[in-house]
Regions:
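Amphipathic heptad-repeat alpha-helical coiled-coil/stalk segments that mediate oligomerization
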Residues: 198-209, 261-262, 277, 368-447, ...
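Charged, surface-exposed helical/loop "interaction arms" that form contiguous linear patches used
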Residues: 355, 359, 369-372, 425-426, ...
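Conserved catalytic alpha/beta cores of large enzymes that bind or transform nucleotide phosphates
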Residues: 161, 166-174, 180, 195, ...
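Amphipathic alpha-helical transducer elements in NTP-driven molecular machines
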Residues: 2, 18, 29, 58-68, ...
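Hydrophobic/aromatic-rich, well-ordered segments within soluble, folded domains that form packed cores
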Residues: 68-73, 77, 168-171, 301, ...
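Charged catalytic and DNA/RNA-contacting regions of genome-maintenance
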Residues: 1-325, 334, 338-354, 358-450, ...
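Short flexible coil/turn linkers enriched for glycine and charged/polar residues
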Residues: 12-13, 72-74, 115-117, 127-130, ...
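ATPase nucleotide-binding head domains, primarily ABC-like/P-loop NTPase cores
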Residues: 29, 224, 294-295, 305, ...
């Protein structure tokens, strides 16, 4: 047996091998040591010849899913080695083979998956400066593919990875030359990475694989060789690990990168689209506010919409019109919501059905979901909007599938499919006949017992059963002399003897044969039903997709109706004009407390950049985030929290909000900040929306202000970028840019001050702030009064150009320039010479920033 184990393990070196022995999956040697640690199992041993004892641990086969899930969640692969023949019928060693390799990206079991999230596996391949990229969720059958070209391909690639957030990544080709990619995956994604050999991406082989899988759709990708290569490599990997066909994956969704708004990792994190930055919880995120879906399919699609805002006006308007129709019809909206609540996860149910792992309970769940389809169809029959009409036409009532399952499968079937009890009486005449014989067994045995008592005259004769001897006749010792010669003794006990007769063995054969025939017949009937349902995959899949879309639209309509959201005017202009905008998440968290609304007016002509000044804690960051969130909501087709809104299509949103040391990569707060700013400057376009919060605060005052101004100038200049920008800063000196730069306007957070007390009014008003109110904010934060008083004294001295050194009693000169270390050491300094040779009037903002760094390095 151990030789068999070694042979199979040799072929699966990169996996933890679950080796079936009886009722357990056993692990040996290093696998056992690893599993015992990760799963907290007792490590034992097994003799394996030549005085060697192999480390061993195991888990019961009937409860293995939980253990496998824990290993896969930690990034391990698990190879399932099953007994492929009945041990009772085996001649010699039981045959065993790998039936499946479970990896983080190939999980299908519902108990191992989050119903609200897709579980993607990704494959990427690069050749000739072109990247092929695909994502597949094997549990739902979804497959997305794209091709990335151009100088910004790395940025596009990481944005795609962020949006799909795969659990497992397969890479090959020139992708390995992207040195920063492994760092990104390790820091930003919870995904395992596997390098595939070059031959896995062989174009001719991959072409054959893709053609065989998608005969009718191959033409959509045939001219994109890198896409064909990643699809072929991924499909081959899935076949190798799943040991089965991939009938569930029957459609390629090819998309272009310019179909969706670009959202990089920092933007998705800073806007807290699906989880909060601090706790990583759903509560407090935009998804938490918008996701009132009733089905698992809807929950996954809602998340996908948030991560892929649209750029197509028609598609956006179609979604909006559907939401508007439901908002305006309360009764329809409530009825649809209630009906959706009864629909199970059709997508993942169908995956288990197609791959033959579904049990009778899964079929009943599908039946229960289908039962609601006629009502949903009837509710939508008179809808007017294009989107709801499309959904209505896409919903197949599947009445034949419902009738089949409902007539065949009992209401509450057992979990297992190999012990009978699944098929309804009346569904199959042969089964009813066999089951009748089996159910009458007690009556038959009672009659035999009565007959034998009459024949023998033994009053306490009994007919019983055990697994060893089958049916037997039991006679107590006091009546042994009355036993007929036709009785064959089988067992002697202390107080009785047990016998069999030929007639009893014949009856036993009929009874036990009926049980076996019944179980086998039930399984065959169940399997026929399952296959019939599987054969209707495309019909059911199309309906499931329609239900998911209806669920998301209805959820957004419910949120809009409950929170007084309005339909924004999304158009092709360059304007973002919102009246009385509110932050949807903050408003939801405040519950009954009022949220102070604010306006915004940006466009590419006269109002490109809004400089926002004001004290910390006053609401600058909240305001900027809410504008970005409202734009994003508008482009997924949602209504928005405002009294009116005009949104010109934005191709990307970039955010630079807050920073912290990146200890893992050895980057300081300032380095992280500058890296993010560099990414924005490199990848933003004139159609982007930029949210820049406190640029330059991670370094000294002069350096920080210089960098902030340079970035501001670059964003405002239409020849260089000209993007719509919200620019919050504590450098009040930058407010002068309103007079110096075209398209720049000043705004501040209104503050009401009475004596030493301040009140943040949370209103955005025109003009720059005249005070940072830092000491007042410190007071609000709970800084001790003694520290506050001392701070006021120091501030007063600084404002008069003085600072009293109490230890040395030295008073500095009244020269405000001395409050910062001079960049210029002396008249002979090389810094002076460098400055003399520089024409500052011709410097670009970025050149000025580079010069600043050079000067700093010369000091």
């Amino acid at each position: 047996m151990m030789q068999q184990y070694f042979k199979i393990k040799e072929e699966n070196k990169d996996s933890i091998l679950f080796f079936r022995l009886g009722d357990f999956y056993e692990m040996f040697y290093d696998d056992a040591k690893l599993a015992s640690k990760e799963l907290e199992l007792t490590l034992t041993g097994r003799d394996c010849g030549q005085a060697e004892r192999a480390p061993m641990c195991g888990v019961p086969f009937h409860s293995c899913e939980g253990y496998i899930a824990r290993l896969v969640a930690k990034g391990y692969k698990v190879a399932i080695c099953e007994q492929t023949e009945d041990p009772a019928k085996a001649k010699g060693l039981v045959k065993r083979d790998i039936i499946r390799v479970i990896t983080p990206g190939t999980v299908m079991e519902s108990s191992m998956l989050d119903e609200s999230k897709n579980n993607y596996i990704c494959c990427m391949y690069s050749k000739n400066k072109s990247i092929g990229l695909c994502f597949c969720d094997i549990s739902t059958g979804e497959l997305y593919a794209t091709e990335i070209r151009g100088n910004d391909s790395y940025n596009v690639l990481t944005n795609q990875l962020t949006s799909y957030n795969p659990r497992e990544i397969l890479i090959g080709g020139d992708i390995v030359k992207l040195k920063e990619l492994p760092k990104f995956i390790k820091a930003k994604l919870s995904a395992g990475v596997e390098m595939l050999e070059d031959e896995k991406f062989d174009e001719s082989v991959c072409t054959d694989v893709v053609k065989s899988q998608f005969a009718d759709e191959y033409s959509t990708v045939s001219d994109k060789s890198v896409v064909v290569c990643v699809l072929g490599a991924l499909l081959s990997y899935l076949r190798d690990t799943q040991k089965t066909g991939l009938e569930r994956i029957n459609h390629i969704e090819f998309y272009k990168e310019n179909q969706y708004m670009s959202l990089d990792y920092n933007t998705q994190r800073n806007l807290e689209l699906t989880q909060t930055m601090l706790t990583k919880d759903k509560k407090g995120s935009l998804l938490w506010v918008l996701d009132k879906t009733k089905t698992a399919m809807g929950k996954r699609l809602m998340r996908s919409w948030l991560e892929h805002p649209l750029l197509n006006i028609t598609s956006i308007n179609n979604r909006q019109s559907a939401i508007e129709e439901l908002v305006n019809d309360n009764m329809l909206r409530m009825d649809v919501t209630d009906t959706l609540s009864g629909i199970f996860d059709i997508e993942r149910l169908m995956t288990r059905i197609v791959y033959g792992s579904a049990n009778a309970r899964d079929l009943r769940s599908l039946c229960g979901a289908i039962q609601n389809l006629p009502q949903i169809s009837d509710l939508l029959v008179d809808c007017k909007s294009v989107y709801l009409k499309y959904i209505y036409k896409s919903i197949d009532k599947l009445e034949d599938i419902y009738s089949l399952i409902d007539s065949a499968i009992v209401e509450e079937p057992p979990f297992t499919v190999r012990e009978g009890g699944m098929i309804k009486r009346g569904y199959n005449e042969e089964l009813d006949s066999v089951t009748g014989d089996m159910n009458d067994s007690k009556g038959i045995l009672a009659r035999i017992e009565a007959e034998q008592r009459d024949i023998t005259g033994i009053p306490k004769l009994k007919v019983g059963y055990n697994r060893v001897f089958g049916y037997y006749i039991e006679v107590s010792n006091s009546y042994k002399s009355m036993v007929p010669e036709t009785y064959i003794r089988k067992q002697t006990l202390t107080n009785c003897e047990r016998y069999i007769t030929q007639d009893l063995k014949d009856v036993e054969g009929r009874i036990l044969g009926a049980k076996d025939r019944s179980v086998a017949l039930e399984y065959n009937l169940f399997d026929d039903v399952r296959k019939t349902v599987s054969d209707n995959l495309e019909r059911i899949q199309k309906t499931a997709k329609a239900i998911a879309n209806l669920d998301v639209i209805t959820s957004l309509a419910n949120v809009a109706a409950d929170n007084r959201y309005i339909r924004p005017d999304v158009n092709l202009s360059t304007a973002i004009r919102i009246k009385d905008s509110r932050h949807p998440v903050v408003e939801a968290l405040l519950k009954d407390a009022p949220f102070v609304p604010n306006d915004v007016s940006l466009d590419s002509a006269n109002d490109r950049v809004a400089i926002i000044t004001g004290p910390n804690m006053a609401g600058k960051s909240t305001y900027m985030r809410q504008i970005a969130i409202i734009v994003l909501m508008a482009q997924i087709g949602s209504f928005v929290p405002a009294s009116s809104a005009e949104i010109g299509i934005v191709d990307s949103i970039f955010t630079r909000v807050g920073a912290s040391d990146d200890l893992a990569s050895g980057q300081s707060t300032f380095m992280v900040e500058m890296s993010e700013v560099a990414n924005i400057i490199k990848n933003a376009t004139s159609k982007s929306l930029l949210i820049l919060d406190e640029i330059g605060r991670g370094t000294s005052t002069f350096d920080g202000m210089s960098i902030a101004r340079a970035v501001l100038e670059f964003c405002a200049d239409r020849k260089k970028l000209g993007a719509k920008t919200l620019f919050a800063t504590h450098y009040h000196e930058l407010t002068v840019m309103e007079q110096l730069l075209d398209g720049v306007k000043n705004y501040n957070i209104a503050v009401k001050k009475r004596g030493d007390d301040i009140t943040f009014l949370r209103r955005i008003v025109p003009g720059g702030a005249d005070d940072s109110y830092g000491i007042e904010v410190a007071k609000l934060a709970g800084i001790p009064q003694s520290v506050i008083s001392r701070a006021k004294e120091i501030l007063k001295d600084l404002e008069h150009g003085k600072y009293k050194n109490e230890n040395a009693n030295i008073q500095k000169q009244d020269n405000s320039d001395d409050m910062q270390l001079s960049l210029i050491g002396s008249a002979e300094s090389p810094v002076i010479e460098k400055l003399k040779d520089t024409d500052i009037n011709t410097l670009t903002p970025i050149e000025a920033m580079n010069l600043l760094y050079e000067l700093k390095g010369m000091i």
